[in-house]
Amino acid sequence: MREVKDYGPDTVYFVSYSKLPEDISATYVHKVVGVGFLINTKTGIIEDVMVTLISDLCKDFLAYLMIGHNIERDGIDELIEKVDKRFFGSSQKAIIVGIKGAYAKYIQWKQANRG
């Protein structure tokens, strides 16, 4: 059994999917890219990131760009700018769509769980 980090009761997982371009290897495996955030809902900080691409280096780099970001305080514009300026993979636009979708789910969750 793999070791799993204890994120605590305030951490919630938000994921969104978007269609990948047809000309990249990940499309043959997944068809879509998933972008998932583990967000501490008390602080708004992204504690971990999941991206369903093939290359571990790519997944690790995208996580590096996003982990620690306060999505509650700062929104997603900075995340999108980082991906736009520092990630030049063919899946860039799909990842940005996934970020927007995961953020929308976070906002929806916050509205449903006020109080």
What label would you give each PLM region?
Residues 19-36, 41-115:
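Active-site- and interface-proximal helix/loop "cap" or "latch" segments in soluble metabolic
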Residues 1-17:
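Short, compositionally biased leader-like segments
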